[in-house]
Amino acid sequence: MLSFNQNRNHSLEQSLKEGYAQMADLNLSLATEAFPIECEACDCNESHLISNSKNE
């Protein structure tokens, strides 16, 4: 009985680890999709501001 419980606990622990790893991967991919758009816009605005200040 003890060995069954240990195996069960190990399986649950392994499932949790895999689940957390999948959630982390999903969060990373969502963040990667969301933030480059903002960064590109920021870069565009920044280069526009720099070119305006050079022209003045």
UniProtKB/Swiss-Prot annotation:
Keyword field: Toxin-antitoxin system
Biological processes, Gene Ontology terms: regulation of DNA-templated transcription
KW rRNA-binding (keyword) present: no
InterPro entries: Arc_rbn_hlx_hlx, MazE
NCBIfam families to which the protein is assigned, alphabetical: antitoxMazE_Staph (NF041459)
Primary role: Antitoxin component of a type II toxin-antitoxin (TA) system. Labile antitoxin that binds to cognate MazF toxin and counteracts its endoribonuclease activity.
Protein family according to the UniProt entry: Belongs to the MazE/EndoAI family.
Subunit structure: Forms a complex with cognate toxin MazF which inhibits the endoribonuclease activity of MazF.
Full protein name: Antitoxin MazE
Species for this entry: Staphylococcus epidermidis (strain ATCC 35984 / DSM 28319 / BCRC 17069 / CCUG 31568 / BM 3577 / RP62A)
